[in-house]
UniProtKB/Swiss-Prot annotation:
Name of this chain's protein: Hydrogenase maturation factor HypA
Amino-acid positions noted as binding Ni(2+) in the UniProt annotation, renumbered to this chain: 2
A GO term for molecular function: zinc ion binding
Family the UniProt entry places it in: Belongs to the HypA/HybF family.
Keyword Zinc annotated: yes
Cysteine-cysteine disulfides: none
Described purpose of this protein according to its UniProt entry: Involved in the maturation of [NiFe] hydrogenases. Required for nickel insertion into the metal center of the hydrogenase.
Gene from which the chain derives: hypA
Pfam families linked: HypA (PF01155)
Native source species: Chlorobaculum parvum (strain DSM 263 / NCIMB 8327)
Gene Ontology BP term (one): protein modification process
InterPro entries, A to Z: Hydgase_Ni_incorp_HypA/HybF_CS, HypA/HybF
Entry keyword annotation includes Metal-binding: yes
Keywords: Metal-binding, Nickel, Zinc
Length: 113
């Protein structure tokens, strides 16, 4: 389960940022997680609650925005939603699809005090 290492990395990053800003408490964290990122959102939520215990982020609210995956056909330029890394263009039936979004895993914002 790599979600625990992700949760711990997020906690480390946001608590370090809070420390740099002279704050001692993280009260909220907002993440963006793409559907093709390989992250199980429910597992990440579970791991987050365990990872933040006894840290400045203990009790912080976690908000996760799930980002749809979008591909662009390199043959015809069509942009369309995708559900896997291997997608076929709905317009020209080519498999030359570049993933435009959906692999994200990032901290959008933190709330500190």
């Amino acid at each position: 389960m790599h979600e625990m290492s992700i949760a711990m990395s997020v906690i480390d990053a946001v608590t370090e940022k809070a420390r740099q800003e002279g704050c001692s408490k993280v009260t909220g964290i907002e993440l963006v997680v793409g559907h093709l990122s390989g992250v199980e959102v429910e597992s990440l939520k579970f791991c987050f609650s365990a990872a933040c215990r006894d840290t400045p982020a203990d009790g912080a609210e976690l908000v996760i925005e799930e980002c749809e995956a979008v591909g662009r056909c390199e043959a015809c330029g069509e942009t369309f939603p995708i559900t896997s890394f291997y997608a076929k263009c709905p317009s020209c039936a080519q498999f030359r699809v570049q993933i435009e979004s959906g692999q994200e895993l990032s901290v959008r914002s933190i709330t500190i005090e």
